[in-house]
Every structure is written in structure tokens, then in C-alpha cells.
Amino acid sequence: MKIKVFQDKRIRAHWDSDIEEWEFSVVDVVGALTDQKTLRAASTYWAVLKNRLKEEGADELLTNCKQLKMLAADGKMRLTDVATTKQLLRYFAQPSTRNF
């Protein structure tokens, strides 16, 4: 696991050698883009956003979102949603995320 930095925000990332792409923690990306103060707030924001995407019929996008164990702030390995750059761009191109 690597840590990437975007506007002074830490984003957990993992290189998937099978698909030869970086996968990023969706919660970390959401937190960075929405300037959430805590990981809990970013997690809540992502949960609401996932529900909106499901309501819009974007289930196929979420189906491709997988979970990996990544090091959490408390030092434990916890499952978190991860997505490639392409998947992230699709999530945030949806109408429900335009006010992002």
C-alpha cells in the first residue's frame, strides 16, 4: 500500500498488478474532494453518495467497486471500497455528484 497526497490530503492507494492500475480508497478521495474534516464524515458522505447512485440505477458502477483491506487511522487493517481512476471519474460524472 502506498500513500498518495492530493492537496495535503492523504489517499491510500494499492497497485493491482493483475489489471496494472492503481486503486484508491474511495472514502479518502471523497474526503479530499469535499474537504471533510474527519474520516467518519467522508465515510458518511460516501455512503449517502452510494445510495444516490443506486437510486439513479448506477448499480453497475458500484458492482465494479471492490473492497480491499487497507491500513486505517487506528493502525488496523480494515476493508474499504477501492476504485481505479477510471471508475472514480465515472462515479463523479453522475448527476447526483455534480454538486460535489
What is the role of each PLM region?
Residues M1-F100:
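An anion-engaging/catalytic patch
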